[in-house]
Amino acid sequence: MTMYATMTTLALTSLIPPILTTFINPNKKSSYPHYVKSIVASTFIISLFPTTMFLCLDQEAIISSWHWATTQTIQLSLSFKLDYFSMMFIPVALFVTWSIMEFSLWYMNSDPNINQFFKYLLIFLITMLILVTANNLFQLFIGWEGVGIMSFLLIGWWYARTDANTAAVQAILYNRIGDIGFILALAWFLLHSNSWDPQQMSLLNTNPNLIPLLGFLLAAAGKSAQLGLHPWLPSAMEGPTPVSALLHSSTMVVAGVFLLIRFRHLAENNSLAQTLTLCLGAITTLFAAVCALTQNDIKKIVAFSTSSQLGLMVATIGIGQPHLAFLHICTHAFFKAMLFMCSGSIIHNLNNEQDIRKMGGLLKAMPLTSTSLAIGSLALMGMPFLTGFYSKDLIIETANMSHTNAWALSIILIATSLTSAYSTRMILLTLTGQPRFPTFANINENYSTLLNPIKRLTIGSLFAGFFITNNILPTSVPQMTIPLYLKLTALSITLLGLLTALDLNYLTNKLKMKHPPHTFYFSNMLGFYPNITHRTIPYLGLLMSQNLPLLLLDLIWLEKLLPKTISQHQISASITTSTQKGLIKLYFLSFFFPLLLILLLIT
């Protein structure tokens, strides 16, 4: 029973020595990146054994707790929960990180600080695993803040570039807003439950208040880039491509969705929280898909596809299916990491060119990268029997059978169609047609550190969904019986988007519009949201803060009230004194009347 718990602990602790060696010997050798990559690969192989044992045993979860500290009101402990979610996620995260680290050996080869880069990647992975295995809110918060600060350091890796620094600060600021919600939920549960353990919180809060649930939703919206707190995700593309791959596949962005999954029992009894989660996820998935349609930066297209898929996961939790959302997290990690690697390979070979309009004809120049990019895009669309199909098709079927919200369902279906459209557009513009890049570009993809990770993730994108779905623990939910036309909804919507993209691509080559329509600008400018929040609102605030003191202090007090008023009175007095006519009797009378008035008052 405790064998797999021991082996999991062994796997997790084996990741710590590479970090400790950097403190003992700061002047590391050039073999350090290979050492870190080998450690992560070994840890992945070790983690397969406890996961297999867990699936074979009828154990629901094992919780290992170590007492840490006791205050007057609460007992803090280091508590690790090894259940279905953590045991399935650990091998996926390790496998993807192993591939990304091997890819980084090629991509970051010329970077003088490559050792520090690998250390940051490893700490990023460890903090995510702390978050996944945590069994109390405080420990989860440590992992939560860990992935936040590591994302800040990695996005701003090329710190000499202004855009990279801005993107890193933007990421940390948007996540700070999400952290407000998390800390609000922490304080509420400490006040009302006197506990941060999920089990005790579920028992004591059978009908929980809306405030902590909104706090969790705000935290998830910040970390998983939901609508309103999403601008940091496309900006994070300023970091190195391996960072983007790790950030978007199995670490930072899925942390928010994982938080909602971990505390799903609290939201199940609150219909308003569920509805808000569903609507937020549905709007996000549509908005991100619309934005991806007109982007020309290959990394930003993949970034918006991540945001769209995260919205789909949040919407799935909103219809009460957290297990399906988790399944989509696991399947999504494979093809999303591979899409970023293929993008990085193309960018690197085309001398840092990221505009898909300046690519084309790469199918013959880079056959393996092109094949993997096509497979990853098809898996993202949800093509049958690729990895993405096993989770995406299930989500759409479940949404079809749900009577919760037809509006949200229709939005999800439209977003699915648009996903197919922008993925097809990316394939057509980058891989097919005539080359549109300079002829002197030195294209060479014959590096083992480039090909091996892409091959591994391609195999994962083909078969991982099949293996994961066959190892899902049996649940008490009865099998659904649905009509054939509903079963084929997801596939038909995907094919519709694919055909639309083909048709639009044909029109683009044949017809040239003089002026793009307003809908194009809405999509291309990301719904004008970054311009409004980052430019217009600060500008208006600055303008008001400048004008208000100017009006109150300079114009009114220093000009109108004091100098001008005094001068006006002086002018009036001088006019009065200068208009004397020499009428002595009248002047004496003017003295006499006040004296008479005073005497009357005295008497």
Swiss-Prot record:
One of its GO terms (biological process) is mitochondrial electron transport, NADH to ubiquinone. PANTHER family: NADH-UBIQUINONE OXIDOREDUCTASE CHAIN 5. InterPro entries: NADH_DH_su5_C, NADHpl_OxRdtase_5_subgr, ND/Mrp_TM, NU5C-like, Proton_antipo_N. It is a multi-pass membrane protein. It holds the Pfam family Proton_antipo_N. GO terms for cellular component: mitochondrial inner membrane; respiratory chain complex I. It is found in: Mitochondrion inner membrane. Belongs to the complex I subunit 5 family. Keywords: Electron transport, Membrane, Mitochondrion, Mitochondrion inner membrane, NAD, Respiratory chain, Translocase, Transmembrane, Transmembrane helix, Transport, Ubiquinone. The chain crosses the membrane at residues 4-24, 38-58, 87-107, 114-134, 140-160, 171-191, 210-230, 241-261, 272-292, 301-320, 325-347, 370-390, 407-429, 457-477, 482-502, 537-557, 582-602. This is NADH-ubiquinone oxidoreductase chain 5. Its EC number is 7.1.1.2. Core subunit of respiratory chain NADH dehydrogenase (Complex I) which is composed of 45 different subunits. The gene is MT-ND5. NCBIfam families: NDH_I_L. It catalyses: a ubiquinone + NADH + 5 H(+)(in) = a ubiquinol + NAD(+) + 4 H(+)(out). Core subunit of the mitochondrial membrane respiratory chain NADH dehydrogenase (Complex I) which catalyzes electron transfer from NADH through the respiratory chain, using ubiquinone as an electron acceptor. Essential for the catalytic activity and assembly of complex I. One of its GO terms (molecular function) is NADH dehydrogenase (ubiquinone) activity.
